[in-house]
């Protein structure tokens, strides 16, 4: 989890640096920044109208370019970033969806029960044509949707009784707005009574009703009274402008943040004395001033603070978030972090997606479970001081320059989702590359596993868990005895013969390690046949001397082993755990035996160097209870125990897919034993 969190933070850092890189490219090519002010005089008439439409100001009665330019200047300063966003939004030809209501309950659930938004609904009476035609309605939907106003169509033929009860006997337009200034209050439905069925007139009617909810100040005395008043609102945003009514985006935000932020419009059109505004620090017109308990904040002086709905919405959300905003943010972060598993996990493709689905389910479940006590905690009484300090911390942190950069980057990447997804994919591929390289350096076999191998191992794990649940999750002790360790005794009880054994494929048997048992100083059959003539020419006296000398050396070794307890304990510790239980004598005591049919020397030591590193040293097969002879074929299991190849193959092929000694599954890997294996030079010759 911490690794994924680190990669996610690294990805956000990459996005931040990439945004600064794009700004540098734009500055190098054009010589301008996104925060640079634009002179409206240099803009065309079409671009000026685009700016007014994005801000929500009507221009139907302004035929001259000069009047349109003055209206843009009165509504606020224009930045290069806002101009670029407005032109890009105008060029986008995406169709905005509109809701078709199926009846009374559907209408009530979406319109009347929605307390923090505006709805524009076209009601079509029975056997009547709609008030607004299809083409004009599509333009209307596109125009109002940029201000967060949702639209829909209610056809009375689907529920005529509800239309009669409402008095909708003719086709009309209905607007739903919150009735009170409290959050989640009642809504009121207003019917359009205008005669002109045009987009601009309908939009003007909508903005007029939305602006009526904003507190408006017309004189300095009223401003002084309002400025010094302390009430329930911790955040107040003032618009000082020479306009008839506030822009539509300002009115839409006042409804969206009902109960959290108070919006106040100060109309300075007919003011003669503006000295009080100078006293409170208002020098320029128009000005967007945020009043907080800590002081005033001038909106529009930092990066990304445009005069638009999206920019001011993200700014206010960061200062006064809802619980739902925090939950959505945590949900996005958790899922972005969970998707990192797709690139961190190595091996088969199916394995990656299985791990991803498992991680997504786990993380989202834990997130929801974690939010339940948080919601319960927030409903406790006497938490006003906690809320106050938390919001104060948010206000301090989110009014910094760094926070403005983060908000600007958020708006940039949200308007370019393809860039966001491509950078996330590129970041993930880099993680996959370095993770694969790191695991290959560690000789990890899972990197090269294919889909079939992984599915086979998954099926083996599932069947092993289904039929032998303890063996699937319990790690066996490395050095222990059944009589001393009760866990191993319980493990043994988990495999009674009365249990059903899983159907496990025997393909893994051919991958088990196999090798020849050899002894030091003993030749193979070919070497024996080649050197037979030389052996026949040896003198009888030399053989007698050699045998007598070897016998003396053997007797000396036996005396040393019996007289030195430290050496004997060392020998027993180095032997395999099965030697004491299943072998008649320990490997050290078995040196006097013959290890091969061709060996007549009693002190020949097995050549342990030919054994795999993770195999336990033993000289007897516990299946047939016979000693290993020189040149015989051996096979080892993942647990480290060694047997005759024929014996263990017959054992496994009979359906007993476990070690005859420790009952470890013969198809399941196990950590190698971290113990010193005796070599030939450890025993004195």
Curated annotation (Swiss-Prot):
SUPFAM superfamilies: RING/U-box. Residues 526-550 are annotated as: Disordered. A zinc finger (RING-type) spans 621-663. Interacts with DERL1 and VCP. Residues 526-543 have a biased composition (Acidic residues). The keyword NAD does not apply. Changing residue 621 to S: Loss of E2-dependent ubiquitination. It holds the Pfam family zf-RING_2. It is a multi-pass membrane protein. Keywords: Endoplasmic reticulum, Membrane, Metal-binding, Transferase, Transmembrane, Transmembrane helix, Ubl conjugation pathway, Zinc, Zinc-finger. GO terms for cellular component: endoplasmic reticulum; endoplasmic reticulum membrane; endoplasmic reticulum quality control compartment. Acts as an E2-dependent E3 ubiquitin-protein ligase, probably involved in the ER-associated protein degradation pathway. It is found in: Endoplasmic reticulum membrane. InterPro entries: RNF103, Znf_RING, Znf_RING/FYVE/PHD. One of its GO terms (molecular function) is ubiquitin protein ligase activity. This is E3 ubiquitin-protein ligase RNF103. Pathway: Protein modification; protein ubiquitination. Its EC number is 2.3.2.27. Coiled coil: none annotated. SMART domains: RING. CDD domains: RING-H2_RNF103. GO terms for biological process: central nervous system development; endoplasmic reticulum mannose trimming; ERAD pathway; protein ubiquitination. It catalyses: S-ubiquitinyl-[E2 ubiquitin-conjugating enzyme]-L-cysteine + [acceptor protein]-L-lysine = [E2 ubiquitin-conjugating enzyme]-L-cysteine + N(6)-ubiquitinyl-[acceptor protein]-L-lysine. Highly expressed in the normal cerebellum but not in the cerebral cortex. The chain crosses the membrane at residues 6-26, 326-346, 366-386, 411-431.
